[in-house]
């Protein structure tokens, strides 16, 4: 049986979104190398690098719920185009920031523009795929992300050895190219009345306009969803160490080169490219509770094992472990949110879900680097192990579906 065959049932609009994500991520190199850019090229302190990443995270927090609401009101596709165009332009401007205040300002603006893409893209994928195919759709989305990420950081590592400014120009160019793809692709969906195809953006926008204008206070009444968001926070803090404590540990303490770090970063993405979709297709019958608990546990074990690492082989082994956790946890968590969200509030639910990652981005990199400076890298990796275990236990205790949610999932 071909485990990839299930992707063939996904609507072509899902593939369009994933294509734009692929192009954008193929140039993603500024964020993975931002800590090294600030500390090596700009000769700024580790503390300021942590503050800069925190500012990015705060921008992400501010935009996530707003982007979700705008997606429900104005249409996901429109918000995605604006996000890519603005963030691409800001990347070209970033290298010209010549003082601390301007670096923080443009970082905040870039974060808001860039992170506005995620809630509408995830909401759109979940809506178009339907309940039966959401795990496959989100696995395809992550496949696109990681095919791109297998290119961006590797190329970025070699560009950084020549000039860090090249990272910004390359990243900005692919971001603008992704925006142009969203404009150029034929977004056409058959009308319900059978009157032939209609313009996809207007139909998607019309569908969004018909959605309820329920406030976030309605979403916050869903206690099961709030428990899930709370459970995700510890492991979300861990996921941002590869752009904070991990590059400092590998380059400064283990003496990897920037190019070596980029290649090592690609180990994660290559595994995901080869394994994630078949893995999630084979686990499609697993309950959310079991998949989420296993994924979080593997993430904690993988990062925690860095405490024993002193060379390339050990680093690769730990990446393999936490990558399997990532491949299980992230598609399952996105599918869970799509399943529990009422159709008219999918953007709002996804906005709060992505806001959790944004909160972790604001805290995790800064916290990881502060702990590393004060207590050493071993304390960071033991802390990541504890965070993974906390999320795993909480997910194992995740309240079961209500009958209403089960009926909603069955109806797609």
Language-model regions: role of each:
Residues 1-11, 189-230, 412:
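Juxtamembrane intracellular "pre-TM" segments in multi-pass secondary transporters
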Residues 7-57, 226-231, 236-264:
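Helix-loop boundary and gating motifs at the non-cytosolic
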Residues 29, 57-65, 149-150, 269-277, ...:
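Residue-level signature of mid-helix packing/kink "hotspots" within the transmembrane helices
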Residues 62-98:
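Conserved MFS/SLC helix-loop-helix module at the cytosolic interface between two early adjacent transmembrane helices
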Residues 63-75, 275-288:
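Helix-to-loop junctions at the C-terminal end of transmembrane segments
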Residues 78-92, 290-305:
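Structural signature of the two symmetry-related core transmembrane helices
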Residues 107-147:
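Cytoplasmic helix-loop-helix junction between adjacent transmembrane helices
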Residues 167-184, 381-397:
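Symmetry-related core transmembrane helices of the 12-TM Major Facilitator Superfamily/SLC fold
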């Amino acid at each position: 049986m071909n485990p990839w065959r299930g992707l063939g049932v996904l609507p072509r609009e899902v593939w369009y979104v994933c294509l734009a994500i692929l192009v954008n991520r193929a140039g993603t190199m500024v964020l993975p190398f931002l800590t090294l850019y600030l500390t090596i090229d700009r000769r700024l302190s580790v503390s300021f690098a942590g503050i800069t990443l925190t500012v990015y995270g705060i921008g992400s927090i501010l935009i996530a719920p707003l982007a979700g609401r705008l997606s429900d009101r104005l249409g996901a596709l429109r918000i995605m185009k604006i996000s890519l165009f603005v963030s691409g332009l800001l990347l070209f401007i970033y290298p010209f920031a010549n003082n601390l205040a301007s670096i923080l300002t443009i970082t905040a603006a870039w974060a808001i523009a860039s992170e506005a893409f995620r809630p509408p893209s995830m909401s759109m994928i979940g809506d178009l795929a339907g309940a039966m195919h959401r795990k496959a759709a989100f696995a395809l989305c992550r496949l696109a992300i990681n095919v791109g990420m297998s290119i961006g950081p590797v190329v970025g590592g070699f560009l950084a050895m020549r000039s860090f400014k090249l990272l910004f120009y390359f990243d900005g160019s692919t971001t603008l190219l992704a925006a142009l793809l969203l404009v150029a692709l034929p977004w056409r969906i058959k009308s319900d009345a059978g009157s032939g195809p209609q313009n996809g953006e207007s139909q998607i926008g019309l569908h969004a306009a018909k959605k309820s204008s329920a406030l976030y206070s309605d979403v916050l009444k869903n206690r099961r969803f709030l428990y899930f968001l709370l459970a995700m926070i510890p492991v979300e803090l861990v996921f941002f160490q590869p752009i904070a404590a991990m590059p400092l540990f590998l380059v400064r303490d283990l003496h990897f080169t920037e190019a070596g770090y980029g290649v090592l970063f690609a180990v994660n993405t290559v595994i995901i490219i080869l394994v994630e979709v078949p893995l999630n297709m084979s686990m499609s019958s697993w309950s959310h509770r079991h998949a989420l608990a296993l994924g979080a546990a593997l993430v904690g074990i993988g990062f925690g094992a860095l405490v024993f690492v002193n060379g390339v082989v050990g680093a690769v082994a730990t990446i393999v472990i936490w990558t399997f956790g990532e491949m299980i946890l992230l598609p399952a968590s996105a599918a869970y949110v799509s399943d529990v969200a009422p159709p008219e509030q999918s953007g709002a639910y996804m906005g709060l879900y992505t806001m959790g990652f944004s909160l972790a981005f604001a805290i995790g990199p800064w916290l990881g680097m502060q702990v590393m400076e004060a207590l050493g890298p071993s304390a960071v990796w033991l802390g990541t192990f504890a965070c993974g275990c906390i999320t795993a236990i909480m997910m194992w205790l995740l309240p079961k579906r209500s009958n209403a949610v089960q009926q909603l999932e069955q109806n797609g």
